[in-house]
């Protein structure tokens, strides 16, 4: 099966640019009720996926080391590329196979899809993969009953 059947295209995906500040990242994650979000560079290439946990750990570690007046400035000046990532979201190419998708989906709630130049073209959501196989399983069950 072609994995592009599952893709949510970039035009329908919220993402961040790597030069965004921590505040901009938090705002976008909060406004969309996400726990993680893909990050691309100005060329449109996938860089990494940032999670709520990555942001919180960075804020906590820097917050404790700053004077009171500098604490608000922290989230408005540090960019997300300055943050350590605790989860390494793997990508797949558009011509990848279902086995790769399933393997990655066990640990990632979405899989970023890139082309041959690492240009971000969209995501495949774990929920879409599960829904597809659930539907297929239910169809097979109904055929056996008939």
Question: For each predicted feature, which ranges?
Answer:
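Short, Lys/Arg-enriched, disordered terminal segments
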Residues: 1-4, 119, 139-146
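Bateman (tandem CBS) regulatory domains
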Residues: 1-13, 75-88
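The conserved cystathionine-beta-synthase
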Residues: 15-33, 39-41, 87-108, 114-116, ...
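Acidic (E/D-rich), amphipathic helical modules within compact regulatory domains
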Residues: 26-70
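Short beta->alpha transition motifs characteristic of CBS
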Residues: 46-63, 107, 120-137
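Regulatory sensory and allosteric helical modules in signal-transduction proteins
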Residues: 61, 69, 81-92
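Short, solvent-exposed cationic patches
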Residues: 65-82, 141-146
């Amino acid at each position: 099966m072609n994995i592009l059947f599952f893709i949510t295209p970039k035009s329908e995906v919220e993402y961040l640019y790597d030069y965004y500040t921590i505040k901009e990242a938090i705002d976008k994650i909060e406004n969309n009720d996400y726990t993680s979000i893909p990050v691309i560079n100005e060329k449109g290439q996938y860089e990494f996926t940032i999670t709520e946990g990555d942001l919180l750990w960075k804020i906590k570690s820097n917050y404790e080391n700053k004077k009171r007046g500098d604490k608000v400035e922290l989230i408005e000046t540090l960019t997300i590329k300055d943050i350590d990532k605790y989860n390494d979201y793997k990508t797949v190419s558009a011509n990848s196979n279902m086995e790769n998708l399933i393997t990655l989906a066990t640990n990632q709630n979405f899989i970023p899809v890139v082309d041959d130049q690492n240009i971000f073209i969209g995501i495949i959501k774990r929920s879409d993969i599960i829904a597809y196989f659930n539907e297929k399983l239910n169809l097979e069950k109904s055929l056996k009953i008939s």
